Amino acid sequence: LDIHLHDSDYPLHVVLHYRVHADYDLIERSVRVINDGKTPVTLERVLSAQWHLPALGEYRLSHVSGRWADEFQLQREPLTVGVKTLESRRLTTSHHANPWFAIDRGQADEYQGGVWFGVLEWSGNWKLLAEVTDFGSTRVSLGLNDWDFAWQLAPAETFKTPVSYAGYTPDGFGAASRTLHRFTRAEVLPHKDTIHKVLYNSWEATLFDVDVKSQSKLAEIAAALGVELFVMDDGWFHGRKDDEAGLGDWWPDTKKFPNGLKPLIDKVQALGMTFGLWVEPEMVNPDSDLYRAHPDWVIHFPTRKRTVARNQLILNFARTDVQDYILDKLDKLLAENAIAFIKWDMNRNVSEPGWPNAPGDPRELWVRYVQGLYRVWGTLRERHPDVIWQSCSGGGGRADLGILRLADQIWVSDNTEATARLAIQEGFSHIFPANTMEAWVTDADAAHVPLE
């Protein structure tokens, strides 16, 4: 169903799009804005949906909050007159909140009670507004964050928002989560209900100290445990001795792998496992061939010093030349090597969010960055359809239905301590199905798990 709205004073045309997913009891909502005039129009706020609840109810909001290593902490609180705002301004979905909500009348549990719920399919800045008006009506608005947002709409051009999905169940929070799980597995995930392999990741064993010899030995240990997929984490690429150099130069380091990755991959396959690799394509170290050649490719303000965090800067994925460079390097890596799995990481938040010489309004950065990410990742998926991809962002900082159209799994948290993971994964499970949840078994310090 499309509802067409025309501004009576300006040549602006808005289309409210609805689609019913009857098999899942979900409604899809998005918005298109069309410039019917002869001059450009600048959009500064356009949400995907506003979901209205039955009138005169006293409602409770469920959402998740968190931080690094403590994501997806379930919160429940009453909604009172005013506006409750949840958002991300971090270029990713964020560790601190998630574009998901569940609302009940304060008495629902896992098995019974009416629950209204919804999500946003987007991997960048977002905003959720849960509002109780002075007339007692309750509504939830969800979409792109209007903070520092703008989009210049040329004549005859169309801007489309991300999609929001919402539903209702009389059977409690468990039924609400299972509805989202079924929909995500059947309609969103690239490999649907695929059962993923048991993997071994090199990071906590060797950190950056990787080479053919050390990783071959580690692969033998992994194979003896019955592991099916061996993943080499950070440290394998050009100039990577520690976290101060190498990001952006996505080819094997010739000192660590003088004959490329093939000898290690052959060893892993001979042991009966497939091979996976860690990358962080959106980042660059100042000490890298890429940055020395293209210092203008990072997100920055020309009048301010560039803030280096984790010894790295963020590549501007809104730029097509940046997209093409990363696409070329990763496509070559996958084409030349038998890589079955990629862990795509994104480890720092944005600062100085500038785009010098942007072709339009520089504030388009927030949306065009995510569109560029989707283009690169989506193209790689098309060219290498059998590869399994994992979304990681310093843990669970990029977890949403938008990224799950590209990634098969989400690294839920960098916190691998078992008792902490119980709460993290409980919150995660309200939104996402279990087959998207990646977890490790690691050693835990006695201070974290006291015998008492």
Question: What does each model-found stretch correspond to?
Answer:
Residues 1-132, 147:
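Polysaccharide-binding surfaces and accessory modules of carbohydrate-active proteins
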Residues 13, 31-33, 207, 238, ...:
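Active-site and adjacent substrate-binding regions of carbohydrate-active enzymes
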Residues 27, 42, 160, 225-226, ...:
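Short loop/turn motifs at secondary-structure junctions
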Residues 134-154, 386:
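Short acidic, Pro/Gly- and aromatic-enriched capping/linker segments at domain boundaries
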Residues 151-169:
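Short Pro-Gly-centered flexible turn/kink motifs
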Residues 167-197:
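Terminal connector regions
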Residues 191-328, 341, 358:
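Aromatic-lined carbohydrate-binding/catalytic grooves of carbohydrate-active enzymes
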Residues 285-324, 367-452:
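Glycan-recognition surfaces
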